[in-house]
UniProtKB/Swiss-Prot annotation:
It comes from Neurospora crassa (strain ATCC 24698 / 74-OR23-1A / CBS 708.71 / DSM 1257 / FGSC 987). The keyword Transcription does not apply. It holds the Pfam family Ham1p_like. It comes from the Eukaryota. Its cofactor is Mg(2+); Mn(2+). This is Inosine triphosphate pyrophosphatase.
């Protein structure tokens, strides 16, 4: 006799970034089924929380169902939190070397990687935010340069790019935020 199947949450993760999708699936599945849809959503300027809430509301309206969105910051302490939620544009314009050059005049190379996920059950449902933070420092690029700023963000002696994917998925800002999401979904399942 087979075990009864348990109901699983299904989330539609809104991203066009295959690396992010892979990490989210590796962390959440099989407990939460992750589907994917790439939508071109205009991002407002604001705090990370404002950007994530707005993106989540608009995605839920477009999809007409439950959505999961994510926004990431890389905050340089010497620059009072910049580039922050604008890291994507800084990275595209400056690259790894340019980001390092922003800190050339500063002794403080410390930084925070911040990930905020927004979940909405659908149109008209207020998004819920889940945030994870990892402290590290900015270093010259090490490791494969194929996932954003992973090659310049060092955590306990290794850049994210140098880490095994499974190891990174245990300690990263994204993993910490997703752990909070998983905890919330687990409570919802028993409610």
């Amino acid at each position: 006799m087979s075990a009864p199947s348990q109901a699983r949450h299904i989330v539609n993760f809104i991203t066009g970034n295959a690396n992010k999708l892979g990490e989210v699936k590796a962390i959440l599945e099989p407990a939460i089924q992750v589907e994917n849809q790439a939508l071109d959503l205009l991002e407002i300027q604001g705090t990370l929380e404002e950007v994530t809430l707005d993106k989540c509301r608009r995605a839920a309206d477009l999809v007409q169902g439950p959505v999961l969105v994510e926004d990431t910051c890389l905050c340089f302490n010497a620059l009072k939190g910049l580039p922050g939620p604008y890291i994507k544009w800084f990275m595209n314009s400056l690259g790894h070397e340019g980001l390092n050059n922003l800190l050339a005049a500063y002794e403080d190379k410390s930084a925070k990687a911040v990930c905020t996920f927004g979940y909405s059950a659908g149109p008209g449902h207020e998004p819920i935010l889940f945030q994870g933070i990892t402290d590290g420092k900015i270093v010259p690029p090490r490791g494969p340069p194929n996932f954003g700023w992973d090659a310049i963000f060092e955590y306990e002696g290794q850049t994210y790019a140098e880490m095994d994917k499974a190891e990174k998925n245990k300690i990263s800002h994204r993993a910490k935020a997703l752990a909070k999401l998983q905890e919330w979904f687990a409570k919802e399942m028993t409610a």
